Amino acid sequence: MQATDVIADMLTRIRNACSAKHETVDIPASNIKRAIANILLEEGYIKGIEEIDDGKQGVLRLKLKYTANKQNVISGLKRISKPGLRVYAGKSEIPKVLGGLGIAIISTSKGIMTDKKARAEGVGGEVLAFVW
């Protein structure tokens, strides 16, 4: 299956796996998905990332994280900038997710980063997604 919006496909796979309480979720690999997965790992939303070589583009296996009483650590994922309607934010307009409790994933000229890092670097860019 070929997805037209690979980031939305990734977020949907993670959301569905969390709802079903799966331990892992497999996502077809790409550089942008790898960068988003690394941000989720650094921010503590997932436990780990494993790269599997399948002879084609590869697969990212994300190890999902739950609290002690089996509640999802990721309570929400939302795609913001879509192929049909791109959303950009200047360095002074970078949104805060839930008053700073969540993260915004931003694609900048210096790479893909969180909203906090983009503010610190003084760069704006395309607002890819919100995670909370």
Swiss-Prot record:
Name the UniProt record assigns to this protein: Small ribosomal subunit protein uS8
Keywords on record: Ribonucleoprotein, Ribosomal protein, RNA-binding, rRNA-binding
Signal sequence extent: none
Subunit structure: Part of the 30S ribosomal subunit. Contacts proteins S5 and S12.
Gene3D superfamilies hit by this protein: 3.30.1370.30, 3.30.1490.10
Chain's role: One of the primary rRNA binding proteins, it binds directly to 16S rRNA central domain where it helps coordinate assembly of the platform of the 30S subunit.
PANTHER family membership: 40S RIBOSOMAL PROTEIN S15A
Record-linked NCBIfam families: PRK00136.1 (NF001109)
Entry similarity comment: Belongs to the universal ribosomal protein uS8 family.
GO CC list: ribonucleoprotein complex; ribosome
One Pfam family per UniProt: Ribosomal_S8
Gene Ontology terms for molecular function: rRNA binding; structural constituent of ribosome
HAMAP family given in the database record: Ribosomal_uS8_B
InterPro entries: Ribosomal_uS8, Ribosomal_uS8_CS, Ribosomal_uS8_sf
GO biological process: translation
